[in-house]
Design a protein with these regions (language model features):
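Single conserved hydrophobic/aromatic residue that forms the stacking wall/gate
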Residues: 1-13
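Short, acidic/polar
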Residues: 33-39, 153-158
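Receiver (REC) domain switch/active-site residues of two-component response regulators
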Residues: 46-47, 167, 223
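Catalytic alpha/beta core domains of metabolic enzymes, predominantly
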Residues: 57, 61-195, 199, 207-208
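Domain-level signature for soluble enzymes in the chorismate/prephenate branch of the shikimate pathway
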Residues: 195, 205-299
Length: 299
């Protein structure tokens, strides 16, 4: 809720949120960036606090907040840092958890990028997915408003988050979005939000059926084959590394590397795969090949 301009917000938000809580009986939440914010919110009886993306990116600021929270166990949500750094995100949870807080949750709001063609902040879904793998008990919420940056993207992003098994959503809503003092383009009216939520398909994490189990066995077989082929490729790469060492050749052969990326990208496209995906796969393979050849040359 944008109830006051930025200069007045620090003074009025406490009283406004208290009023909202009293009149509606709803839980209220707000962002904190300093120890002073924490003390004011605790004094006002705010139910939930969240740490913003720019604050998460600053370990010193997170530690200041953690120190201010010692002795209480209020729910704390932590947005991902602006840059795609999972370890930095996890580090923020560790700092807050070490202060004695146990009710923690994550907010995925996307990552800053120069590429603004579609999203305001790139989703990079693999990062929150890896967070879930690393900390499976941690609730993860999606912020489609900040990811999309445009209200027409809110609905599809909400559904995508639900399809990926996110635990909830944090959506910006305003009674008159075009008049909002900040982020107007990404806000929706309460009626539109209600419409979006009612259209959501919530899928279940069902138990494995016999047919699904068979398909997963096929995936396991494919993965085993991929590992074996990669191991064979790395053996050949090490032989090439030995040859380069004996003939005083540089490890990086740019022409050959570009040829591989171009040809494999084209092959992938013919097989129905995205060329950018294939490029990333072979970039990772090349990086490991270079690492292994470096070990050989430096022996």
């Amino acid at each position: 809720l944008h109830l006051c301009d930025r200069r007045q917000r620090q003074m009025c938000i406490r009283d406004r949120l208290k009023r909202v809580k009293q009149e509606t009986g709803m839980y209220v939440a707000t962002e904190v960036a300093t120890a002073k914010h924490v003390y004011e919110c605790l004094k006002a009886g705010i139910d939930v606090l969240w740490i913003g993306a720019r604050t998460t990116a600053n370990p010193f600021a997170v530690q200041e907040i953690a120190d201010a929270l010692k002795g209480v166990d209020i729910p704390i949500l932590i947005k991902n840092p602006v840059n795609p750094d999972l370890e930095l995100w996890i580090g923020a949870f560790e700092r807050i958890n070490n202060a004695g807080l146990k009710q923690l949750g994550a907010i995925h709001r996307g990552f800053s990028s120069y590429d603004k063609k579609i999203y305001r902040n790139l989703p990079q879904w693999h990062i929150p997915i890896e967070l879930r793998r690393r900390i499976p008990e941690l609730p993860i919420f999606c912020d489609p408003s900040h990811i999309g940056g445009k209200r027409e993207l809110v609905a599809p992003l909400c559904q995508q988050a639900m399809d990926l098994g996110f635990d909830g959503l944090i959506v910006e809503s305003h009674c008159n979005p075009d008049c909002a003092w900040s982020d107007a383009a990404q806000q929706v009216t309460p009626d539109v939000l209600d419409y979006i939520l009612n259209l959501l398909v919530i899928r279940k994490e069902t138990q494995t059926t016999e047919n699904l189990g068979e398909l997963r066995n096929q995936i396991d077989d494919c993965d085993n084959e991929i590992i074996e082929v990669l191991a064979k490729r790395m053996r050949v790469c090490r032989e090439i590394g030995t040859f380069k060492k004996e003939h005083d050749m540089t490890i990086l052969q740019t022409g050959r590397y570009n040829e591989i990326l171009d040809k494999r990208g084209a092959q992938g496209s013919l097989c129905g795969m995205d060329s950018e995906f294939i490029k990333k796969v072979f970039e990772a393979i090349h990086e490991e090949s270079v690492r292994q050849q470096m070990e050989i040359i430096n022996k």
